[in-house]
Amino acid sequence: SPNGLLQFPFPRGASWHVGGAHTNTGSGNYPMSSLDMSRGGGSNQNGNWVSASAAGGSFKRHSSCFAEIVHTGGWSTTYYHLMNIQYNTGANVSMNTAIANAPNTQAQALCNGGQSTGPHQHWSLKQNGSFYHLNGTYLSGYRITATGSSYDTNCSRFYLTKNGQNYCYGYYVNPGPN
């Protein structure tokens, strides 16, 4: 994705933990289209908002825990393990709009199945309907390098680069799209 298109999918100024890239299902190693992000807070996620990560979005509410936003240029972003989704299909949402909360319960997080080890959002990038490998993609001005296997947090294979500096998995503050 071009630099400036995407921001972290949590509110600007907030700090969330960003884990290693992985496939949408978590199995296999390609395309690593997804990131898990969490704010902490245990079983009370009511104040932890998930935000639209790109502009010009047409909202799709797939279920009570899964949403997608279709952006320009064939891009879309998906958000799983949600609760309290704020919009219905067809709504137009802009970048940084609060769309839902991270889930309070595992049952809510997994309303469409899968696995979860604690409250977090599962964010994915798609282009023309297919999951898109994040290696080389920009998110909040950070260029993602993801050359290992799913959930790999070894900083030689998964890291984010900004202004010539490499950053490993960990907490990031959302500066916006750049």
Curated annotation (Swiss-Prot):
Domain of life: Bacteria
One of the GO BP terms on file: proteolysis
An example molecular function term from Gene Ontology annotations: metalloendopeptidase activity
Catalysed transformations (reactions): Cleavage of N-acetylmuramoyl-|-Ala, and of the insulin B chain at 23-Gly-|-Phe-24 > 18-Val-|-Cys(SO3H)
InterPro entries from the UniProt entry: Dup_hybrid_motif (IPR011055), Pept_M23A_Blytic (IPR000841), Peptidase_M23 (IPR016047)
Positions of Zn(2+) binding: 120, 122
Keywords, ordered alphabetically: Disulfide bond, Hydrolase, Metal-binding, Metalloprotease, Protease, Zinc
Keyword NADP set for record: no
CDD domains the UniProt entry points to: M23_peptidase
EC number: 3.4.24.32
Cofactor: Zn(2+)
Free-text cofactor note: Binds 1 zinc ion per subunit.
Disulphide bridges: 65-111, 155-168
Record has Hydrolase as a keyword: yes
EC class of the enzyme, as a word: hydrolase
Protein family: Belongs to the peptidase M23A family.
Protein name, as recorded: Beta-lytic metalloendopeptidase
Organism listed in the record: Lysobacter enzymogenes
